[in-house]
């Protein structure tokens, strides 16, 4: 459960992200594909090369979903219900991949929000991304 301080930290970090959420989402995907090559199996139809239009488009979806989640911190299950259904029932993504995605998203945010990426912000973002992952895997049960 995110505390009031966690929510404030997450909102402040995403305020610094601004309109770059899609770019950061694409960068995080590239990091994930390089760091965890098995994640590529979910994207056999994508051009996974650096700067690929498909990776950029999917990165925008990831970034937009996270921005939406930040706007609904008090109702993450409601905000992410459709994505949870998609990943559980249609795409059948292995739940461990959400932890991998969280890891590379944290790294990407740390790079771009450097000055504001304090230990407290890091902890809050980690809790937020873990909460998002929990919601996205909730339909697997």
Swiss-Prot record:
Similarity section: Belongs to the globin family.
PROSITE patterns documented for this protein: GLOBIN
Record-annotated Globin domain positions: 1-141
Gene source species: Lyroderma lyra (Greater Asian false-vampire bat)
UniProt keyword list: Acetylation, Heme, Iron, Metal-binding, Oxygen transport, Phosphoprotein, Transport
InterPro entries (alphabetical): Globin (IPR000971), Globin-like_sf (IPR009050), Globin/Proto (IPR012292), Hemoglobin_a-typ (IPR002338), Hemoglobin_oxygen_transport (IPR050056), Hemoglobin_pi (IPR002339)
Annotated GO biological process: hydrogen peroxide catabolic process
Upper classification of the organism: Eukaryota, Metazoa, Chordata, Craniata, Vertebrata
Residue numbers bearing the Phosphothreonine modification: 108, 134, 137
Protein name: Hemoglobin subunit alpha
GO molecular function, a single term: oxygen carrier activity
Residue numbers carrying Phosphotyrosine: 24
Residues reported to bind O2: 58
Keyword Cell division applies: no
Residues where heme b binds: 87
Function as written in the Swiss-Prot or TrEMBL entry: Involved in oxygen transport from the lung to the various peripheral tissues.
Residue stretches spanning the membrane: none
Subunit structure: Heterotetramer of two alpha chains and two beta chains.
List of residues that carry Phosphoserine: 3, 35, 49, 102, 124, 131, 138
A cellular component term, taken from the record's GO annotations: hemoglobin complex
Keyword Ribosomal protein (UniProt): no
Modified residues (N6-succinyllysine): 7, 11, 16, 40
Coiled-coil stretches noted in the UniProt entry, renumbered to this chain: none
